[in-house]
Amino acid sequence: MRNEIGYTNNLIKIIEDSRNNALKKVNEELIKMYWKVGEYLSMESEHSSFGDAYIDSVAKEIQNAFPGIKGFTRRGLYRMKKFYETYKDDEFVTTLLTQISWSNHLAILSKAKTAEERDFYITL
């Protein structure tokens, strides 16, 4: 009986570790996607004569292409653009930023008043 419990606990640990690793990978890919979308929007809005209407149009096109997708509203796209523009010159982007959830990034971006304060929370 003891060995069975030990084996079961080992299996539970394997499953938990794999699930956690999968969630980390998904988060990493989402953050990279938000970064790329923000970069694209930042670059395009510099060259676009439409201003805010450009991002409104992009949000509608994304909603049409992916009905029901969440996070790609006008507000969400502006957040991605701000995310990119805030961190584009920082060296630690590719490693540290992908380890933090999107909701934590949004909290840091909205609450931190200085770059030093943002860096502090990111490197915790």
Whereabouts are the PLM-identified features?
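Basic, low-complexity intrinsically disordered segments
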Residues: 1-124
